């Protein structure tokens, strides 16, 4: 792999806020030479409208969906709820730290590029725009993971990455272009061998499911393909370098496999890394490996 496209998830001290007194957020413990940002790195900055308290912690207006109100909370407090929402709080320490870094990266990228759909909020607990959130799931392990990675985000060329992750790679990660139909360059996403834990659930590593003809027709329509009449054939399109299918062919007509998966139910069709596809007597049978889009960090690999 060329060095130009190789990313070892640079852990920048990226939430330095030079516009405010005491604004530097130093991680604890101090990062070693393998992870700290280069001396000449242009570190990403918080938007100017984000307030930083006297301890250097960004303060966010968070719309809490379950309570239908906006709460003011420090970034690290918000991240605790996100981490508990995205990963089980009894998982290994290093896995929690990795997820915390990605969660913080997601927040910084969101604040830099987007606005919350909720008026007066910087971000929310609504998974339609942000990350899962579970304040009740926060325990000492969660707090420690957030504290020990304080200020750390994953960067590529001094910019926060799009912090994609998935549950299980099925043995191969994928690029954002293929795994997510992403239209912009994201060279830090690569096809690599997965390193999933042997303790991962069997139905995440390998899965099988079935769908009715009506479900397939509706999913195709939701994914942008309107079928006239019933279904005669269902086939897998070409595979990318990771082995994932880019398109599903319904009566010979292509539809994005990623969009079809979301439309038909991503908790049943768990990935596009298909190992079997067959249509007979009004039933679509699918089997595959992995859980999720396969882009970025595998949680069971972490």
Spans of features found by a protein language model:
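Conserved, single-site charged/polar hotspot
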Residues: 1-302
């Amino acid at each position: 792999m060329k060095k130009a496209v190789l990313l070892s998830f640079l852990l920048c001290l990226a939430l330095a806020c030079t516009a405010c007194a005491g604004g530097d957020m130093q991680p604890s413990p101090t990062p070693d030479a393998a992870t700290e940002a280069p001396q000449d790195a242009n570190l990403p900055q918080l938007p100017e409208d984000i307030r930083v308290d006297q301890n250097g912690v960004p303060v966010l207006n968070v719309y809490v969906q379950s309570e239908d109100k906006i709460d003011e909370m420090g970034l690290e407090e918000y991240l605790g709820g996100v981490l508990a929402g995205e990963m089980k709080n009894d998982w290994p320490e290093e896995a929690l730290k990795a997820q915390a870094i990605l969660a913080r990266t997601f927040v910084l990228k969101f604040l830099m590029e987007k606005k919350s759909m909720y008026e007066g909020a910087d971000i929310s607990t609504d998974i339609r725009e942000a990350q899962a959130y579970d304040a009740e799931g926060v325990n000492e392990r969660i707090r420690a993971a957030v504290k020990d990675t304080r200020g750390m985000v994953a960067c590529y060329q001094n910019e926060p990455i799009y912090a994609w992750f998935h549950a299980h790679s099925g043995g191969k990660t994928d690029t954002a272009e293929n795994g997510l139909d992403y239209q912009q360059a994201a060279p830090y996403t690569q096809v690599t061998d997965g390193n999933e834990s042997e303790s991962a659930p069997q139905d995440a590593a390998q899965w099988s499911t079935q769908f009715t003809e009506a479900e397939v027709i509706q999913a195709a329509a939701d994914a942008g393909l309107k079928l006239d009449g019933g279904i005669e054939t269902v086939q897998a399109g070409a595979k990318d370098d990771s082995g994932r299918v880019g398109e599903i062919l319904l009566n010979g007509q292509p539809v994005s496999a990623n969009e079809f998966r979301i439309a038909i139910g991503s908790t049943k069709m768990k990935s596009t890394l298909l190992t079997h596809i067959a249509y007979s007597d009004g039933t679509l049978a699918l089997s595959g490996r992995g859980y999720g889009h396969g882009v970025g960090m595998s949680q069971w690999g972490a």
